[in-house]
């Protein structure tokens, strides 16, 4: 409904915005809201499947939110020609968050900040990432070291890569109290699941118990890092 676009322009955070949706219905609502604020000259609406309606170089940042992580990844993968070096990505996937972090890491985008919040019993993650260097891996390519330093991007971290993918390197580094709360709740839930599984039998039960134990150990590791 273009609420974010309107907010960005009204607060002076963006000069111009392109608000896009894959369906015409939401775009009609967006246009109505944009017109009611008198921002029709600064906010353009486009029918677009992901980032396909954007021309490379036309924008310098994108916000993708309100959908599952796999769809976010699909949009990013198909729109790689748009998010070139220095492009800013603000992402808020509703699921598959570790997969989104991993995709960014493996496709030349560095997560430079992440926030986690809770509202009405639900947790939300907001990831800020910057792309650069023609999609080369910033973690494995020595040739990107100078470029990342010039961009002010720190690629060094004491957080193991897998842990960072699964739980958020930046959240751990800033010792996020919301992440801690989520993990304590998750650990308690896993304990209950393990207890119930221990009373059942079968090969699948054994495999599931191993998965629960592995996740519990990871969470305990992260909780130690959050102290």
Located regions from the model:
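An accessory alpha-helical subdomain
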Residues: 132-227
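S-adenosyl-L-methionine
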Residues: 20-60
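Active-site segment flanking the S-adenosylmethionine/decSAM binding pocket
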Residues: 52-80
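Active-site capping/gating segments
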Residues: 18, 23, 96-98, 106-136, ...
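Short helix-capping segments at alpha-helix termini
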Residues: 11-13, 35-40, 81-83
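Short loop/edge segments at beta-strand edges and connector loops
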Residues: 47-49, 93, 113
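Conserved SAM-binding loop of SAM-dependent methyltransferases across substrates and taxa
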Residues: 1-15
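Conserved beta-strand signature within the Rossmann-like core of class I S-adenosyl-L-methionine
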Residues: 83-98
């Amino acid at each position: 409904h273009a609420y974010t676009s309107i907010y960005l322009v009204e607060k002076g955070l963006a000069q111009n915005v392109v608000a896009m949706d894959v369906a015409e219905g939401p775009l009609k609502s967006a246009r109505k809201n944009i017109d009611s604020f008198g921002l029709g000259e600064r906010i353009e609406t486009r029918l677009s499947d992901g980032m396909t309606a954007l021309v490379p170089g036309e924008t310098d940042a994108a916000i993708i939110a309100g959908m599952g992580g796999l769809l976010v990844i699909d949009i990013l993968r198909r729109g790689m020609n748009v998010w070139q070096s220095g492009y800013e990505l603000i992402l808020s996937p509703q699921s598959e968050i570790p997969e989104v972090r991993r995709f960014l890491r493996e496709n030349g985008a560095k997560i430079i900040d992440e926030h986690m919040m809770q509202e009405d019993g639900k947790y939300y993650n907001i990831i800020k990432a910057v792309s650069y260097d023609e999609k080369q891996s910033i973690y494995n390519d020595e040739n990107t070291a100078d470029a990342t330093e010039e961009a002010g991007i720190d690629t060094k971290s004491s957080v193991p890569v897998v842990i960072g993918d699964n739980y958020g390197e930046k959240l751990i580094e800033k010792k996020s109290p919301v992440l801690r709360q989520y993990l304590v709740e998750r650990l308690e839930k896993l304990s209950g699941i393990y207890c119930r599984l221990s009373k059942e039998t079968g090969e699948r039960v054994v495999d599931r118990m191993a998965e629960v134990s592995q996740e519990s150990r990871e969470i305990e590791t992260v909780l130690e890092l959050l102290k």
